[in-house]
């Protein structure tokens, strides 16, 4: 039997999709339309009732929602996700696993790269634990599937988990049966690893999250990176027009021209402060002067600084957070980073760093790519 996965018929969502079921190409061929569909499904993880309603139109049943409501002090390395399936006319089981991006209290988990304290691991342990939790939770379900085909998707935190989960499912069910589309994907693996031609990571090279953990630490991603053409001035009007038609905007459209170089400067400066994983988590930088902090003075690790920046400093308004403002008061190892084009121009209502990471920006530039 022909092995296909069917595009979901999405109605009343972020972008109009074609009616009916349209067969997707090979799992190893990037499909822009399926990518847009996957992004919408991933984004709707924040609205699970809408997600279930929309997918039910195409006959998908919600198998379950998992870890959606977490206490702020929940330190388990698990992901929030939804699982759907349907049986096709040719008796194949189509499974959708949509993994939510960062929720309340999860930024710390995002940056808790090696919770075991083993800094030599060849993978991002925090995200791998979340992927393995999904597999172990649904071991019996997976064992019972007959001729399954999977669509695995996620944005940001969800993308990292989806990247690893997609690789694990591919190892078990073969690449032709596993479609993986991730967006704003953190780095998940380093060293030698198999090539997964069915895993597509849609990347904005101006997005800070796609550089974490630092490439200088050797981290990459499973699969193939599909880099958005955000530095192409000729495509900028098309991307802006597509953005302005979306209902998931988080602020005005922000031009990405020149932002990739600025982001790479920020990442290089951060990596220079933390040349390896252990240094990033253990070395305390003084807050009142450049250099290492002594045992009796205030200090901050590079990891803690990134947590502060991403969970508090990367706000959707022009003003820096209180914690960021306090670090800006004195010269130290971190303050130069806060002035490397961190905040957008005065006439823009959102920080450019935040804007480059948002699903609406990704969707708009994917439209331009098409």
Model-inferred region functions:
Residues 154-158, 162:
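Gly/Ala-rich beta-loop-alpha elbow adjacent to hydrolase catalytic centers
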Residues 164-168:
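Active-site signature of alpha/beta-hydrolase-fold catalytic machinery across serine-
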Residues 17-25:
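Sec-dependent signal peptide cleavage junction
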Residues 8-16:
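Bacterial N-terminal signal peptides
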Residues 58-153, 170-182, 193-200, 292-294, ...:
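A conserved cap/lid and substrate-binding interface adjacent to the catalytic center
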Residues 1-4:
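Positively charged n-region of N-terminal signal peptides that target proteins for export
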Residues 26-27, 56-59, 65-78, 92-94, ...:
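C-terminal His-loop and adjacent cap/lid subdomain of alpha/beta-hydrolase
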Residues 178-259:
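The feature captures the conserved acid-bearing segment of alpha/beta-hydrolase catalytic domains
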């Amino acid at each position: 039997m022909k092995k296909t996965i069917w595009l979901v018929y999405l109605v009343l969502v972020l972008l109009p999709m074609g009616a009916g079921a349209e067969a997707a190409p090979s799992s190893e061929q990037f499909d822009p339309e399926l990518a847009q569909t996957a992004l919408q499904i991933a984004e709707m993880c924040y609205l699970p009732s809408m997600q279930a309603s929309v997918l039910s139109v195409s006959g998908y049943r919600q198998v379950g929602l998992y870890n959606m409501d977490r206490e702020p002090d929940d330190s388990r390395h698990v992901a929030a996700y939804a699982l759907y399936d349907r049986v096709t006319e040719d008796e194949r089981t189509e499974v959708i696993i949509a993994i939510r991006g960062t929720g309340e209290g999860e930024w710390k988990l995002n940056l808790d790269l090696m919770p075991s304290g083993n800094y030599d691991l060849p993978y991002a342990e925090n995200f791998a634990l979340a992927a393995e939790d999904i597999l172990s939770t649904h071991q019996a379900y997976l064992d019972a599937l007959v001729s399954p085909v999977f669509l695995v998707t996620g944005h940001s935190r969800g993308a990292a988990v989806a990247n690893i989960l997609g690789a694990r499912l591919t190892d078990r069910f073969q690449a032709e049966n596993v479609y993986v589309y991730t967006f704003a994907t953190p780095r998940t693996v380093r060293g030698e690893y198999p090539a997964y031609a069915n895993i597509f990571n849609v990347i904005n090279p101006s997005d800070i999250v796609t550089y974490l953990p630092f490439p200088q630490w050797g981290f990459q991603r499973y699969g193939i990176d599909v880099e958005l053409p955000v530095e192409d001035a000729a495509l900028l009007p098309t991307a802006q027009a597509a953005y302005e038609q979306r209902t998931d905007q988080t602020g005005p459209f922000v031009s990405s021209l020149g932002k990739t170089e600025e982001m790479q400067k920020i990442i290089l400066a951060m990596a220079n402060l933390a040349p390896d994983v252990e240094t990033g988590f253990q070395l305390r930088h003084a807050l009142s002067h450049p250099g290492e902090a002594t045992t009796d003075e205030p200090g901050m690790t590079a990891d803690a600084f990134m947590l502060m920046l991403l969970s508090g400093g990367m706000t959707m308004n022009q003003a820096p957070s209180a914690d960021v403002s306090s670090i800006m008061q004195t010269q130290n190892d971190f303050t130069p980073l806060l002035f490397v084009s961190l905040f957008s121009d005065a006439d823009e209502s959102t920080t450019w760093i935040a804007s480059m990471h948002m699903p609406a920006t990704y969707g708009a530039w994917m439209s331009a790519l098409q």
